[in-house]
Amino acid sequence: MSEAEARPTNFIRQIIDEDLASGKHTTVHTRFPPEPNGYLHIGHAKSICLNFGIAQDYKGQCNLRFDDTNPVKEDIEYVESIKNDVEWLGFHWSGNVRYSSDYFDQLHAYAIELINKGLAYVDELTPEQIREYRGTLTQPGKNSPYRDRSVEENLALFEKMRAGGFEEGKACLRAKIDMASPFIVMRDPVLYRIKFAEHHQTGNKWCIYPMYDFTHCISDALEGITHSLCTLEFQDNRRLYDWVLDNITIPVHPRQYEFSRLNLEYTVMSKRKLNLLVTDKHVEGWDDPRMPTISGLRRRGYTAASIREFCKRIGVTRQDNTIEMASLESCIREDLNENAPRAMAVIDPVKLVIENYQGEGEMVTMPNHPNKPEMGSRQVPFSSEIWIDRADFREEANKQYKRLVLGKEVRLRNAYVIKAERVEKDAEGNITTIFCTYDADTLSKDPADGRKVKGVIHWVSAAHALPVEIRLYDRLFSVPNPGAADDFLSVINPESLVIKQGFAEPSLKDAVAGKAFQFEREGYFCLDSRHSTAEKPVFNRTVGLRDTWAKVGE
């Protein structure tokens, strides 16, 4: 497939193609502008892939700019986390990391220009009064009594704000546009507010901070952004974006284009709700493998390639829709099926003893991937006592059950055919040991007499087993749209994390965090980066071998 054929097609790329063909632009310059007040989630991944992907495909540039205009909510911890997430996803920003705070001096000068043009004024209404005066979707707003102050008075008052002469909430700078506008965003929006808080980049230099809508468009223009891409909730804000740039002296006027945000089933994207999950300890942190954060997905075992593929598949449109969780899971399942080496682990172990097996044991050869001989093979120890999964044995079963049944045969993966002879139980009637015999002439081959053995189960040698903790992660919520519930916390899936103590083949003692494996017949797993120790590895289930939720929804 050629490079052109491999590129996704969407309405934004069509606009860019037209702009380049007409000569409106000779290059493409985009940006990704997160606020450093939290961790990025899968919705941000869509924006990252769009902005950086466009720059990559058109051989342009993409800036990473932190919209750091609210020092109360922001932290350098989030800055570093976001930079790490962007790089982990496989993208690199153009030049240095940028901050909106880099432009605070220019933004202040542009605010003064608007005051001098009679297009901005210092308002002393309280925040509550400003909301009241703004009106509603059906009722126009009304002018502030401070709206008609002179230019000189507004300049003096704005300087007083700058010098710390007002308390927080006692004054702000507003644009003078139209309080009767059908668009609430155009009803004299606030441009600057007072916050006595230390800023992670500028320290205590400023006590007035520009609002997002004032900062964003000017930052785009100062950086020479050609296509400013944002989600649909900012559609009305485009009017203010254009108004600001039309009324200041700036040589470049970027254009804003909106696309639909990513909504994903069985999770929430609201920063407030995600924060509540963390602070109320429903999850163990922002990187909990059940969270939709990029750090959570990474810890769970999602690869950057699978997330990029997911963003490519869902596409870019202007129509809001909700994506099935199965779509995301399908991307990682396909990736790991292709690339993850195989290993054996028993999640719910029961002891199996092969009574006629002689000797200390032996090594059996197993391929690391059944379809990729280039991935090599490994030696796995086999002995007379092994662990198998409790679900792989029944005393009685129908013909559909293809695993081990009392009096019948099954094959041990890449080893021998065995037959269950008897069981031993505890006082409560639970099976503690399964006693078997084996056919010594069936190591990785069919029985010589031609009898058919259909079932295959996995196993781990008891003498060589690595004790492991296995964390079976599942969807965090039990309903597709938890955000619609009166209390979204009430629909948390109680089975979203089930912890098991099992055994794994000894090769897994060399596993490293983030390295994925297919535990044969169980699913895809990776070593946990937070809880694993050399003595007790912890493996997280990334995704099952198939979509078990599909049956639930039928």
UniProtKB/Swiss-Prot annotation:
EC category: ligase
Sample GO molecular function, one term: glutamine-tRNA ligase activity
Motif 'HIGH' region per record, residues: 34-44
Residues engaged in binding L-glutamine: 67, 212
Keyword Coiled coil tagged: no
Chain sites annotated for binding ATP: 35-37, 41-47, 231, 261-262, 269-271
InterPro entries (UniProt xref): aa-tRNA-synth_I_CS, Gln-tRNA-synth, Gln/Glu-tRNA_Ligase, Gln_tRNA_ligase_bac, Glu/Gln-tRNA-synth, Glu/Gln-tRNA-synth_Ib_cat-dom, Glu/Gln-tRNA-synth_Ib_codon-bd, Glu_tRNA_lig_a-bdl
UniProt-listed Gene3D superfamilies: Glutamyl-trna Synthetase, Domain 2, Glutamyl-tRNA Synthetase, Domain 3, HUPs, Ribosomal Protein L25, Chain P
Compartment list: Cytoplasm
Gene Ontology terms: cellular component: cytosol
Entry EC no(s): 6.1.1.18
Principal place of residence: cytoplasm
Source taxon at top rank: Bacteria
Keywords from the named record: Aminoacyl-tRNA synthetase, ATP-binding, Cytoplasm, Ligase, Nucleotide-binding, Protein biosynthesis
Pfam families registered for this protein in UniProt: tRNA-synt_1c (PF00749), tRNA-synt_1c_C (PF03950), tRNA-synt_1c_C2 (PF20974)
Catalytic activity field: tRNA(Gln) + L-glutamine + ATP = L-glutaminyl-tRNA(Gln) + AMP + diphosphate
Short sequence motif 'KMSKS' region: positions: 268-272
Gene Ontology biological process terms from the UniProt entry: glutaminyl-tRNA aminoacylation; glutamyl-tRNA aminoacylation
Record-linked NCBIfam families: glnS (TIGR00440), PRK14703.1 (NF011291)
HAMAP family linked: Gln_tRNA_synth (MF_00126)
Assembly description: Monomer.
Family that this chain belongs to: Belongs to the class-I aminoacyl-tRNA synthetase family.
UniProt-recorded name of the protein: Glutamine--tRNA ligase
